[in-house]
Amino acid sequence: MDQNPLYEVVGDVSDVPTGLHLVAGLTGFTDSGSAVGQITELLRGLPVVRDLVVFDNDALLDYRARRPVMFFDEDHLSSYEPARLVLSLVEDELHRPFLLLTGYEPDFRWEAFTRAVMELIERFGVADTTWINAIPMPTPHTRPIGVTVSGNRPELVEAFSIWRPRTQVPGNALHLLEYRLQEAGHPTAGFVLLVPHYLADTEYPLAAVAALESISAATGLIFPTDELREEGRDFTQKVEEQVAGNTELERLVRTLEERHDSYMEENPLPSPLVDQDGELPSADTIAAELERFLASRRDEPRP
């Protein structure tokens, strides 16, 4: 395998089977509900994880924007934890291998990074590529998390994409990868989760569940979600307790529900996210009332 200056191959990769799915999720862009962060932690915590390729931080990372962690031990620096952008070989719950691209979104050289990933896709004979992102939307937490699907797999768009706007969006590195893969005719799908925007700054377990379900729909891979679902039930119960104690909150959530349901029933409204005048509903009151709950949850130690 010819060496590319943007990455280093870790050991012998000649035994990596061809025809695997590639799953990608990068942090640094919008990650509402910490969906990408949570699934990265879960997938890299699976029993079988083997790093194949490590990308060069000095070429791709802005250290001053995302400073690495240094560990200070009384009177000296004891260790250094740099960011990592890595392609790994992982196994799902049924011990089926797949490729996983995780880490930071490159700050620099997006075209070169895209070419490098496409080179790896060709080298490993990847069958298809699926990537995940999550953005905030004024949708209610009482309804299933919706997704917008992009790419060149129309069966996934038709089955799962509930919002299909014509608009300009701020691009990310995986958008560019998808665009180039489409040009090359490689099967690719991007799933953008529509997370309730008043929960966007939390670690929302059901966002991670929705992300894993999307990956499963695109690839057939199976992942452990029982713990996340249980955390999601506890999280939702706490949110419901906050909402139930405030009439204004109840009214605002009900309004979001009505807009969502009208859209899902093919109401002529152009989107569940706007009213008939095209204005986004305000969630300031929701955010203010939930602030205490969200802050307290962030401070809770994780088991």
Give short role names for the model-derived ranges.
Residues R96, Y104-E155, L176-L177:
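Internal, conserved structured core segments that host functional sites
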Residues A24-G25, T102-G103, W131-N133, V192-L194:
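Short beta-strand segments
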Residues M1-G103:
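N-terminal short beta-loop-beta anion/metal-coordinating cradle
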Residues L26-T30, L101-W110, F160-Q168, Y198-T202:
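Flexible, glycine/proline-enriched loop segments at strand-loop-helix junctions
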Residues L199-P303:
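A conserved C-terminal secondary-structure "cap"
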